[in-house]
């Protein structure tokens, strides 16, 4: 077989493809990942062709057996790739024809690579997306377990990267638990676009055969059939929506990594990462670097970039299919791999880190973290207007800063000079770190009672997710 004859479109051309066309047009270096989905779609298509009389039972059996052999060859590393065959779809069809001859050439009846490729990608998103969902649920499970263990650990809560108020560590961990629940639901929503059957749309106008697309939908386990063949082959909304979900997830993961980097630094020091998840320096022997967190933070930019790449590529394309769309898979494949390894890395860090509560206590005291509690004490117990209370406590903090003291060790005489209420057990209770968190009794707050309540709700949410996806 000559090179020209190997091309699926070779009949029209009198010259072989140039070297640069081969090099710039090949996609087998990355779209080989679609082999399972391509074979899955081809088997469904072959069964449909049998339904409408294009194939007989013997031919269908030959095709199914040969496709199963090709799948085995690919998985065992015995499949021979040829640079002139461009992509995984041509490779599989060429090998099929090698195995069963003319019968193999019938498989592409009523099918274009345009609808074939977009269908493969939709199936790939569904298959890989389920794995990402499992990883999200596993990460949520790790956050839940860590939160349960951290219920009695008090750490600083921050706004503007400055110490704000004491919180239970469980409150912090559960804040990411709920963010990841939204990511989980975003992926579920994104899957809907991939659950639409594109196969049967042909090149773009439909096909000249009485194909049974409802049959194909059921064979592939999809939920609906694309109502318009032009939209079916040209839309990449299924990839866009999936990458939007990946991007939101990676933004959350990157922010967790930023917290880990900060909180494990000498300046903060409220958590410690295990040695196995950190690295040293080639010149500075004292260093213990949170490389995994930094690398994941960096990888988040790649996923955001992949989404932007696809958005820019799509914005100026005319209807319907254009070869530019070959580039969509690079963005998709890279995002999937990046998300998966990032979820693994962040999970190990969460499971492995240790809180350092004594350092957290020092930070809370030095950061005047219970100043708001003191103001609320004046409002609730002494019936002082909040703005007046705010001013009194602000003055107290100013004196502490000037004298390099805290709310706990500033002499009573200095406190009384500001307010007669800044004395005795009432004052001590008002600024107490241990009591502060339990004063936050509003729903969703950081009091122990509300945290126990939230842990129960979180467990119910986790069980429901595991029931649906694991």
UniProtKB/Swiss-Prot annotation:
GO terms for molecular function: argininosuccinate lyase activity. Gene3D superfamilies: Fumarase/aspartase (C-terminal domain), Fumarase/aspartase (Central domain), Fumarase/aspartase (N-terminal domain). One of its GO terms (cellular component) is cytosol. Its EC number is 4.3.2.1. It is found in: Cytoplasm. PANTHER family: ARGININOSUCCINATE LYASE. This is Argininosuccinate lyase. The lineage of its organism: Bacteria, Pseudomonadati, Spirochaetota, Spirochaetia, Leptospirales.
